[in-house]
């Protein structure tokens, strides 16, 4: 390259790139390093950006940085060697060495410092460690977080990788699908032995971690310290203990079993059947090592002698026990075909101190249901009056607007940008899911049977005695499925069974039947208090549903096809019912659709003949009338027919890669754009094809999205019905707010670190750095767990090509849980303290580090700090009164709340 300033011809050789002579050859060692760095300085002075400089050398920015680091290290190595020679061979002191080399004395001291030498050689040391691992194991994961395991910076790791690439090792990027999040992937970066092909990295069983992760359980750790240490719960799933059927009684339909269908009654005080701190739980209990019970477990005080478990069923008397119970699955990792919750198994100890596994395996327990999201699904609200719909959607809009206004007032730009990004994503999601603001004091509760209650009563300890509440079960067919009941918290029987339950209500079987045939095996309802301000429309039950029992009407027939895709089928019939409600279907038509939905929801679980139900109820005829549409080319389609059903309807779009661009003027997301600098068209779409195995045709690769996400105007999905228009207005408002948030985000500046704050909050900054290091060190372990889970999934699919998506999802979840436990993958959210938040606000943390902290912190906690709210903190006297009232057994949760002037949620916090 000709340099007119020096009138000499230079040729800048770059490692693994161009150059006539080997790297480091010539009269002066490392002269090419010096030339390379000098050229970078020249290009910088000419105004070129780092990216442009990298491109001028034919490198990516990552490769460029690695080459630059190597050049700097080699230049420094020359300086260190020179300084040492002058000191050791010529006897010069630091001052003399500095004058000789043209450096100041502090730089000389740094060159001769052994710690500095270690830092300089960090990349070489890392390269040696990685090389050894490749030689021993093969393909090695070198993705995010590995640099922390090596205790070096990412730049030093990239430098080490560049060194290894010079030796012929190859680096590839890729991805591993997240086991429990279809459509999402964990990025993969690996280094492989020379000659490895890119496709080989997708044999996940052969991708190894740099370090070996051996995880000791808490039990092993504690027992090593104390041999008498007692563990309450297994650290992972243990094959269940089995109940002797001699201890089990079945209560059949004729004996009252239907009134408590799905309830498992337990003898109180029996060690191997103890529910722990819960009054109730959704459980699985193995019986005789070949069958199992599933349902809601509660305590009972009237079991016959010799019986410890009583199961209620709607099956007729004379049905053999093995037909009442479920057969265990052949998979020892999942014998119940359902996932047991973390901590859902426990141990008990006999009089001699011997450990035994409890018979109880919990799917969910008291407190789990009350944590469900509180909002109003369109499936319910769209069937109510327009004034209620408008009110709740307007509240949701105002809540979002207030949140946006608050975020815009925040002064910390990094926090502001992070929360604006999160806010925009939430708004995009809100537009698709169409969920309105919750009604006052609504909550999700699990239902338990109290046969002695009247058809107009409910035992609901979290609501006021005497008030009226509406119950809504999902999937929701219409207003004819909504019972309005009066709270009776004085009912002695209910109080003895349920007590001050955190998230359960008691009803009788007639009420459950009206709720689209709900069972007492873990079914839930949304409870909404009704009054003059909150009027819920409830209409009489449909005559076509009276006495309808899907299990009796459509039992299994030999040779019939058993449903596998419950979620898909429920989506189809739910959309049909929604469209029928909006388009004014008759009661008879609605009854047909709802009867079929009742069959569908239990078809897989109870092997019901849903195909016959589809014929008997003429579902095809209902689709023809309420969902038929003709496109612009004259093609007939059946499916989602209104905005409410179309919003979440899937649509295939060209496959995309990476994140969308944000339009600077509008804030809208763009997958294609015209580059303002070059005028060239840029695209995030992936132009890939594959051969369809079924048709043999070559087709373009696509991905799934939703109709609402893909449209810029929700009204394109509406038929013009007033209720649809209310939801269209809401969706467009959310889309607009999301765009505003993104526009605000890209116009927000960067954080300027404050020197005084950095010094003042040195301790807090160090604490946050340490917490971040722990959080980021989990990344390689999580990748290893994902790789292991995917390897298991591949083997399962190979052995069971007909496995359902639902079953595969369960098995993947279980495989991932097990893998995480094995390698110790446990993402620990950074718990930011008030003092650390003070340091963040003062500018003691750099922009880049704060971004990383926020990505690994509890975002709700960050939001809480950034938006201080008045929190209810009770005095010790009030806490004492609260506990006294609860422990007396004479007051419900709602009555305690009323007496103390606080909410029931605050009472539950102190329970």
Q: Which role fits each region the language model picked out?
A:
Residues 2-33, 502-535:
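Amphipathic alpha-helical packing elements
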Residues 52-55, 96-101, 146, 895-897:
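Short alpha-helical "recognition helix" segments of helix-turn-helix
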